[in-house]
Amino acid sequence: LSFAASLYTDAEQSGLVAIAAAPGGVVRYVFPLEHRPMLVGYDLHAEADPGLRADIVNAIESRHLVLSGPYPLGFADNVLIAHQALFSPVQSPDGVGYWGTVSVIIDLEGLLTQAGITEELRDLDLAVRNQHQRVVFGSAGIFAHDPVTASVTVSETSWELAAIPI
């Protein structure tokens, strides 16, 4: 818990909302717990949104960090959830046993603001969309106006940033 506390304190300014550990896919540990006790007992494999479940399966099968979202949650307008599956040789004879998943919940607006991507930029209209073409920041119309674009890949998730002059 002290590791989670120091990580949370250092990253809170950049939009970190919570850290959750789910042994066997069921959330057992959440930091900070006092603001998100409803997450304890949540079964990522049974209760989660189908897209979220698919991303968790992808994290397990690929053994890479997988970014989900954005999702509207009760405690933030839109969040991204980064999932990392953990494996333990103790869990299975072949040494590849799935222990569970650690997820980090990130406030999307806070992350974009920390990165300097805000709608208040004076000379540009900005938008960001994920690999499923869902716009997560800005207006979808920006992509229809011949924008300058850049692709950003975070682990196995791609994002497209677009900008047009105002």
Segments from the language model and where they lie:
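Intrinsically disordered, low-complexity polar/acidic regions
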Residues: L1-E160
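Short beta-strand-to-loop transition segments that serve as allosteric relay/switch motifs
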Residues: I164-I166
